[in-house]
């Protein structure tokens, strides 16, 4: 059985003729600007960049399931760094979902889920066209912020 435990459905609350009380089912209703922030948080910082990085390395290392990659300590460390260290300081908080909690769920529930048959090969499709949106927003946010830290590489022995 394929099952994904976590779900987020954020919809613009704009129904001129009314709507059922779908929030009782967990749907989050908000304004258009917040919906856009949630999408940007997911696509540009807290999920898709992590998935894309795992996909590329998964293809190179011969993995056939994204969930199996999370058992590799080095790959897990890489996506934790992308999410927490690189993304979280500059992500735009949509206010309706906490970015840190979102990344926690992505790294501890969603990506490691063995019942999601996601493959690195599928996610890596058209990676060259995804890079700008997956990583570009984080890079732009760093360049525009004061939290850009640069440490020169130490010489290797």
Name what the model sees in each region.
Residues 55, 59-63, 89, 93, ...:
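Short, well-ordered loop/turn and helix-capping segments at boundaries between secondary-structure elements
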Residues 43-58:
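Conserved phosphate/anionic-ligand binding catalytic regions in large, soluble enzymes, centered on
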Residues 36-37, 124, 139-149:
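Hydrophobic alpha-helical bundle architecture
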Residues 75, 79-132:
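Long, amphipathic alpha-helical stalk/connector segments used for oligomerization, subunit docking
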Residues 1-36:
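Primary mode marks residue(s) on the alpha4-beta5-alpha5 output face of response regulator receiver
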Residues 39-43, 71:
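C-terminal, charge/polar-rich interaction regions
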Residues 59-85:
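Catalytic phosphate/nucleotide-handling subdomain of diverse soluble enzymes
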Residues 150-157:
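Conserved small/polar residues in nucleotide/adenosyl-binding loops
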């Amino acid at each position: 059985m394929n099952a994904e435990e976590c779900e987020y459905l954020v919809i613009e609350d704009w129904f001129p003729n009314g709507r059922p009380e779908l929030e009782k089912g967990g749907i989050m209703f908000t304004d258009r600007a917040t919906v856009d922030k949630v999408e940007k948080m997911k696509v540009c910082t807290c999920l898709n960049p992590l998935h894309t990085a795992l996909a590329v390395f998964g293809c190179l290392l011969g993995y056939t399931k994204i969930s199996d990659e999370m058992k590799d300590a080095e790959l897990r460390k890489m996506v934790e760094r992308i999410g927490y260290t690189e993304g979280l300081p500059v992500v735009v908080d949509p206010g309706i979902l906490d970015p840190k909690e979102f990344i926690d769920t992505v790294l501890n529930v969603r990506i490691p889920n063995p019942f999601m048959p996601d493959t690195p090969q599928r996610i890596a499709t058209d990676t060259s066209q995804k890079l700008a949106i997956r990583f570009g927003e984080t890079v732009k946010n760093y360049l525009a912020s004061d939290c850009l830290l640069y440490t020169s590489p130490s010489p290797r022995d």
